Amino acid sequence: MTERTIDTSCARVEEAVLAALRAYDAATRAGDIEGQVDFFADSWRSSSGTTKADLREYLRKQVDGPTDREKRFVLDDAEVVFDGDIAAVDPVALRSPTGGGFFEFRMTRESDGAWRCVSVAGSRRADRLAENTRELRERILSDQARPGYHFVMPEGVAMPFDPNGAIYWKGRYHLFYIFQDTRLGKRSDHWGHVSSSDLFHWHHHPTGLLEGMYSGNCFLNREGVPTICYHQHGLGNAMAVALDNDLNEWKKLDSSPITPQTREGDEHHGKYRSWDPFGWREGETCYAIFGGKRPAVAKSPELDGEWKYAGDLFAHGVEGVAINEDVSCPDLFELGGKHVLLCISHRLGCRYYVGEWRDEQFHPESHARMSWVDNSFFAPESLVDDRGRRIMWAWILDEPLFGARTKHGWSGTLSLPRVLSLGDDGLLRMDVPEEIEALRYGEVRKGPFVVAADEEVPMDGVAGNSLELLVEMEGAEASHVGVKVRASPDGQEETSIFYDAEAKLLKVDTSRSGPDDTPQAVEAAPFELKPGKRLKLRVFVDKSVVEVFANGRQAIARRIYPSRPDSIGVRVFSAAGDARVHSLKAWKITPSNPY
């Protein structure tokens, strides 16, 4: 037989292989000796050395046995994998009154065009899955960029990786996230699902929300059942209802899409798009925000009723942002006596409005950003828990040259959970929930001490790529005061976090964080310290992620990619004036991700 490569793109070839196995099954149950013999290739050998020439006589002796005709070869779970001119079919289940098992049949197409068996062995499917899983895990565990306590995509590349559908339900935090695969025969977006009792150790659930799942949220319907309002790719905005308390099973409503149907002459015809929705129940009415450059509000008396547009989301514009700045990934909630609208725009990244929701419109009073330089902090999602805490996550994007598919084999990182509150100045306050303290170990304390002008002080005993720092310092005459992390001994690699007193900005400078082909941006967020006030930095380092919280009033998240194994140092520095460090506390943080 001449060697050839099979065109595996043709489904007919796979069907021909399976048809040969079905014919063998039928011949076995019928006691058809010639049909059974013909199934095997001339080169076939059994594990005991039986050849095709010996097989006919063997079968004649067995055919009158009481159970042979009751054997069944079941192909329900079998997959066909092609390797050159060999087709491996695995697992093939053998069912027999005297036992059974799972097998791999290796088939080849012979010169007459028929597919015949060249070998039979125990199924290797479980072994191959285990080997592949182990290989992936070992690769990921050795990846110096993969965060250990920020939630990351458990396997593969997720782009986008928006958090979605967050809800506190039956004592657990549930979080969904967008990912992509080809399980349905084509590349499609699904919602992965995890839950946790402590916000850091996550249990993975089966994927119950499949195909075309884009951004959306989760809320309780009139019956108190978790309900998601989401964008169904190719269909429009849609609804699904949970069928169990673990939120594993969902029913997509037959009434979807909920996108209102308008006609020429209707008041709202042609105004709005079906885009990133956010749904909720208010009294007896269901509402949904439809995102876009002209975001809309839709409503219905019933989830599966007729939805109609109520009109524009915004009652008016607000200083600092154009009225037509697109609203995507919206999240509307009450906080501190006001209403907050978290969202992104594709130009400004993560941002929020503070104002009032009344008369079926949002009346914004102020607007602020949560990403300033390159929109790498993206797609916010929040929930409220049993303690009344409003907790949000966001997607922290990889830099474009990360090499997710070719080098690292994964992509998808969420921010730390942030507990939100509203200050008297109308700006959000943000901090990490107290549950993270359970991950701390190896505490080191420093201070008080003075850092001379234009000097930096290494923090002996404080080093690592998985850290939490609490630094309290002041420098009345200094232009810059702050801390450097992931610093190499010679200073060639370092990430600088500091308060710029002249510009009144909190800055994270990544211009020396890694090689030239990694991000070099300086993220700068509005932040002002009044005279006599101390700078209080809370810094989280997690391999390629740095998150900074300043006085509970401002926060920055950045990706960094140090290349040197000795880039683990911590230094405190001051520029153009002395600084006094009142205290520095440091902890190592144990990973909460399994790998």
List each model region and its residues.
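Surface loop/turn signatures of beta-propeller and other carbohydrate-active proteins
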Residues: 128-165, 183-186, 200-220, 247-281, ...
